[in-house]
Amino acid sequence: MDALQVVAEPRRRAILRLVWDRELAAGDIAARFDVSFPAVSQHLGVLRDAGFVSVRRHGRTRLYKVDRKALGPLRPMLERMWNEKLDRLVALIEEEA
């Protein structure tokens, strides 16, 4: 799975936002979603395999946190996509005016 496919999934993006500034246990992350723990665990595995989150063990708990360096190469691509969408929005607004 390429990097864009990894971050294209809405729940994975939400997980990245949750662990952007702090470590969270897998159970704490799962508690914030309306899907099963195994489903969230699978998303965490995809993020970990892509290198977007780091995981460390604390006893029996796994703590997850974003690896910002790994997300760095995505930034220019995401900014381009964002700017294209904003340009389209501006064009639509101008057409309506």
List where the protein language model places each region.
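Conserved active-site alpha-helix within GNAT-family acetyltransferase domains
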Residues: 44-45, 74
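N-terminal helix-turn-helix DNA-binding core of bacterial DNA-binding proteins
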Residues: 2-36, 62-72
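Alpha-helical residues within the helix-turn-helix
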Residues: 31, 42, 48-49
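Amphipathic alpha-helical dimerization/coiled-coil segments
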Residues: 17, 21, 72-97
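Beta-hairpin "wing" of winged helix-turn-helix
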Residues: 48-59, 65
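Catalytic cores of transferase enzymes with a strong primary signal for eukaryotic protein kinases
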Residues: 3-8, 55, 83, 92
